[in-house]
């Protein structure tokens, strides 16, 4: 119902324009055919053509009608702009009155006034957007000069035939206008919309992309032919001077990287050549404008636009690597790492091999690879040396432990030897020297510690007979009644054994002595004497305290005196 109301409104406008006689109906009929060929659901499609200017090569165009009509009426091109669902601004030769008329035609309030109250919930004005629900950016599409996008088939065709751009320029076909400005905000109702709120947030319709509504069939064919041959980048890499060598790239304007200034859209050299009467058209980029223009200027592989500089620098680096190797070899030789430069060039070690390859690298990727190999080989060599050092330290530790065991056993053996030696020395000291001190320390003669009497001829013991007392000989008298002069002849001293015969040898001590010491005999003499018990105990005690022979002699003299006094 809304579509019929739209068409009836357009027919009434055509009837009013026909009596004027200023324009033929052929342009309007072609325009209506394009309107009827589109579906109402395609109204919210791409409207990038709203911001493009088509210079009609004919004399008076449909835009001249819009100039003569009032601001309250909707002209034929503006109505078609609203119905086609594409943002393509179609006008004649641009001028300030035409821009004002076009801005007035796109006013949203005028569109509602032209439709009247016959629109429903699916009306064209609602499909065109209300200004707040649309996804239009504040800057007009492609104002910063992004690469144009299109159908993938056109992209592949243009990639296969890169010479079509030059053919279009030779045929005088329109060139795309980079960084064009938006619609002027000169209407009262257009300040909020600016002609851009008519693009809703719906998905892009690829079927309506190539449809351009123009007042001239010849211009339509030229624009369609131009759009078909135009390079696109919707599904492939952007065409750059590095990827398309056959096409001469126009130099970029200085406003392409930061956006064009208002009122002065940048243009290329080819646009200056064809800017006379050549129509220009621009298709909206399907990609949202992000970043800056400098991103699309660089190829995808990251290389420079001028590969000649890198090639020259690479060749220069290849020429310099020989001198670098010589300098490195000289440095290693001076540091003492290697013996000579020939060793660095001919060494088969992994570190030296990667070092030579790193110095001979032609680019940074190869150099990075070789440097990584050098680091890993050096790390592996260091780890191997660390393992060798660990094994060596382990062997040294085992050797030290074995040395400790050997030293411990040797110490024990040495202690045993020392103990045996000391026992032998003590035995020898007992053999060769006396334990106590002698009185005559001045004597130079050596006195043995053990004295053995020389062997004597023993007299046969005769049994005592009382008849012997009759003999004059006192030899057989008992000791108790023997005279004192015979006591000096006792050959067995008590404490100090004097050797009256120095001829006695040192081995005589080994001979058993047949005569015992007389200390026990002296005690028996005292106990058998007629003295009292107290005197006997006193003499025995004093005898046990004697230290020398003189003391023993003095004690025995006292004992004898007491006995004599008692007997007498």
Curated annotation (Swiss-Prot):
It comes from Sendai virus (strain Z) (SeV). It comes from the Viruses. GO terms for molecular function: RNA binding; RNA-directed RNA polymerase activity. Phosphorylated by PKC/PRKCZ, and other unknown kinases. Phosphorylation is necessary for viral transcription and replication. The N-terminus contains the majority of phosphorylated sites. Ser-249 is the major site of phosphorylation, but is not necessary for most functions. The P/V/C gene has two overlapping open reading frames. One encodes the P/V/W proteins and the other the C/Y proteins. Residues 50-59, 191-206 have a biased composition (Polar residues). Keywords: Chaperone, Coiled coil, Phosphoprotein, Viral RNA replication. This is Phosphoprotein.
């Amino acid at each position: 119902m809304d579509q019929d109301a739209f068409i009836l409104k357009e027919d009434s406008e055509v009837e009013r324009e026909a009596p004027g006689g200023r324009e033929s109906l052929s342009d309007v009929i072609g325009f209506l055919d394009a309107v009827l060929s589109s579906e109402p659901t395609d109204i919210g499609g791409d409207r990038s053509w709203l911001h493009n200017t088509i210079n009609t090569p004919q004399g008076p165009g449909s835009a001249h009608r819009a100039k003569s009509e009032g601001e309250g009426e909707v002209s034929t091109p503006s109505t078609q702009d609203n119905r086609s669902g594409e943002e393509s601004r179609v006008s004649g030769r641009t001028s300030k009155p035409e821009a004002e008329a076009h801005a007035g035609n796109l006013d949203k309030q005028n569109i509602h006034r032209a439709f009247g109250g016959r629109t429903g919930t699916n009306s064209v004005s609602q499909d065109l957007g209300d200004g707040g629900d649309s996804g239009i950016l504040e800057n007009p599409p492609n104002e910063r000069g992004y690469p144009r996008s299109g159908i993938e088939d056109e992209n592949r065709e243009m990639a296969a035939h890169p010479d079509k751009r030059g053919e279009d320029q030779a045929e005088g076909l329109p060139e795309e206008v980079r960084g064009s400005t938006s619609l002027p905000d000169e209407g009262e109702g257009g300040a909020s919309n600016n002609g851009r709120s008519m693009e809703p947030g719906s998905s892009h319709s690829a079927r309506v992309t190539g449809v351009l509504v123009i007042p001239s069939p010849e211009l339509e064919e030229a624009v369609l032919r131009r759009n078909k041959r135009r390079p696109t980048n919707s599904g492939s890499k952007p065409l750059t001077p590095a990827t398309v060598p056959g096409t001469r790239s126009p130099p970029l304007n200085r406003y392409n990287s930061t956006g064009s200034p208002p009122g002065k859209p940048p243009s290329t050299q080819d646009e200056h050549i064809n800017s006379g009467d050549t129509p220009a058209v621009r298709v909206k980029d399907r990609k949202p404008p992000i970043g800056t223009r400098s991103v699309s200027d660089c190829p995808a592989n990251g290389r420079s636009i001028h590969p000649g500089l890198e090639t020259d620098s690479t060749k220069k680096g290849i020429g310099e690597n020989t001198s670098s190797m010589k300098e490195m070899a000289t440095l290693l030789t001076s540091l003492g790492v290697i013996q000579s430069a020939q060793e660095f060039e001919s060494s088969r070690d992994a570190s030296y091999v990667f070092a030579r390859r790193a110095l001979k690298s032609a680019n940074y990727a190869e150099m990075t690879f070789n440097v990584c190999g050098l680091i890993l080989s050096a790390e592996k060599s260091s780890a191997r040396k660390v393992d060798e050092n660990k094994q060596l330290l382990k062997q040294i530790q085992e050797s030290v432990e074995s040395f400790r065991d050997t030293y411990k056993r040797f110490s024990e053996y040495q202690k045993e030897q020392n103990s045996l030696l000391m026992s032998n020395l003590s035995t020898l000291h007992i053999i060769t020297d006396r334990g106590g001190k002698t009185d005559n320390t001045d004597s130079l003669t050596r006195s043995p510690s053990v004295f053995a009497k020389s062997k004597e001829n023993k007299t046969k013991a005769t049994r005592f007979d009382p008849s012997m007392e009759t003999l004059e000989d006192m030899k057989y008298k008992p000791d108790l009644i023997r005279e004192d002069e015979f006591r000096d002849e006792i050959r067995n001293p008590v404490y100090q054994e004097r050797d009256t015969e120095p001829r006695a040898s040192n081995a005589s001590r080994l001979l058993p002595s047949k005569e015992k010491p007389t200390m026990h005999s002296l005690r028996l003499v005292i106990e058998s004497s007629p003295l009292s018990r107290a005197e006997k105990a006193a003499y025995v005690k004093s005898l046990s305290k004697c230290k020398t022979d003189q003391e023993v002699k003095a004690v025995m003299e006292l004992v004898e005196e007491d006995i004599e006094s008692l007997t007498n």
